[in-house]
Amino acid sequence: MRTGKYITKYDYIGYYTKQKAMWFFTNAEIKAKIDLLLKNVSSYDFEDLDDEEEHDYEIDAYEIYKEQTDFLSQLEINKNIDVDNPKIAEGILLDKASQEDIKKTYHYIKKIINFETDPLFKNKSLEELANLTLELIDKNDKIIFFQPVFINDKLITKPDCFIKKNDEFIVIETKGTSSIKKHHILDVFYQAQVISKHPYFINKCISYQMCIVDYVKLKKNQVNFTISPYYNYQKSVVLSLPPSAANQFNKFEINELKRKRKRGEAIYLKKDENKKYYEDIDAYDHCKGILIDDLIDGTYSSINDYKEAKKIYDYKTEDLKDDVRFNKTMDELIKGIEKLHNDFDEVISELLVHKQNLLALPIEQRIPNYFIPSYNDKGDYKDNDFWLELRNLYAYSGYDVIKYSGKILTIKKFGLDNVTKDILGIDILKTYANQTFFNLYKNNQIKIYQAAVDLFAKLKSKKVYFDFESINSAIRAVDNSFPFTQTVTQNSIIIDDGSCDIKNLKCTNMIIDPREINNEWFKAIIDKIHQGLEYSYIVYNKSFEASRLKEMAEFINEEIYELKVSEIIKNMYDLADFFIVSMGKQLIVIPELKGFYSIKKVLPIIEKEFPQIYHDVNCLNYKELSVGNGLVCQTKTTKRFFNTITDLEWEQFVHDARIYCENDVRAMIAVEYFIKKLIDEAKMKNLILS
């Protein structure tokens, strides 16, 4: 538990992103409690959140590292951080790289102080460091601080960087992501309440900016940072272009648009007289984006400029309905920021009272309490860091609605704080869409539709089954790549040319040390998969494998590999399509799946209902494997990339990872024959639905 005498930014952020039972506890403590509660749970395994609208692959290693160092500094004890954690190892590298890029940006400032790394300040108390911070600001016209300390009454903050340029002050918050995210405003807003309202800074101008991983291509082992004064007001930072527009910009232009989007900058697209899209550069003279400073000050002038510029320069607001919708979004943004301003003192008071109540308990009782569904599990700013584990816990605890996919029963719409154990008492089920979906799952009857029959008929007699594992990091694992590129480190493949029984199909397991990834590795993968146009290339969730293949072909940059990848993707066959349920489109509905379609959920049903298929294909139980899911694979491989795993440990992991990835492709074969069995039985009983 964070027992320090001050409220920190992590406490404040937690107020909006964690349920009350988690306040003031570290992520390690929270996870330990959840793991204990889930110790005997074997079902409702939400390893793959296939019902989430968007998967955020950018884990902020910098924030993980900084939160741990902040926790240790609050305890004021000399304890080393966990450098064996690959995200901590990555966070240390990001910390150094971000500081170097900030120093390059302000190269004319020679006075640089780092409270965290300079031995001169190692044994000083937080109060001493806070006094030193103000003293050094007073004595220097130009100075760069890394990790200075500001204390204002019961609040403390240590911004990543504080810069003084004569009478100008700049606070820079660093994030180990390639985009400014909606919840980052909580961090900056707290900093401003502590620093700008400090007696020393009254009537002084302070600017607030973000330092993020720059979305540019770099060589292997490199990372760059960029500083932005803008805010991204949406949870999603994915660049969304009209289908026709995506083909009217070249790759460089699209990547630049992505970079702007990630930096929080505005994007203005117009149509010319030929209905062709182009970026309206003139608009940026009017407004480049929503300024963080405007939100902190409560002036909102850049929001007004943004609204006006959008109306003039962007195709989306040419339509009155779109214009009204956009203005409503901006009004909601202002309303949310005003609420942060109005509620700040009350929030701090509530946090202080809760902390005192926890500290009044005996030390052995200062542990996270039992968790119940909370609005903050999927709040306004971000999902709870432990949403996956909480879903398991809630399902196990009798909250039946949680057992259903969010694509069937839309969790966000009814709010987790309104969840009851009586699924029929939840109002959201009374809406047409959710009631329609729910009716599909009310009984135990498997439903087979004609669309499933038609899709299965498209499967060729010759087949290639393959599955990738990957790592992604802000620090590049391969030359000429963007940050957080999903770089393939493993490929398991089974080729079925129809010449042998499924019992005898052999699997090739390819795996590489992530420190040695190069184009020859990518060529070997593509060469092994590509067998010609007469084959179906079978995957589970084709968007992942298709994207990785395109990226590998781009890295190689040879026509023959572009052709091979094109042929593979053109003949790609996605088994997940049979189980994905959407309004007006169902292929196979299995009530036991409750709207999920992950292969790890389908396989146990096959083992139970058709054990012969399961055993003929040589499938294994994921829960009995040393490496049982992709996250473990990625974590261990990332440890190797950052040199935090020994050669002996790596050898053992390679053995275990091969078994896991091979099980993925064998599971695909089992799923294929499972589908065939269901269709054949439904045909015999004349139960195919239109």
Swiss-Prot record:
One Pfam annotation reads DUF2779
For this chain, the family text in UniProt reads: To M.genitalium MG366 and M.pneumoniae MPN544.
Q: What is this protein called?
A: Uncharacterized protein UU173
Question: According to the entry, what is the taxonomic lineage of the organism?
Answer: Bacteria, Bacillati, Mycoplasmatota, Mycoplasmoidales, Mycoplasmoidaceae
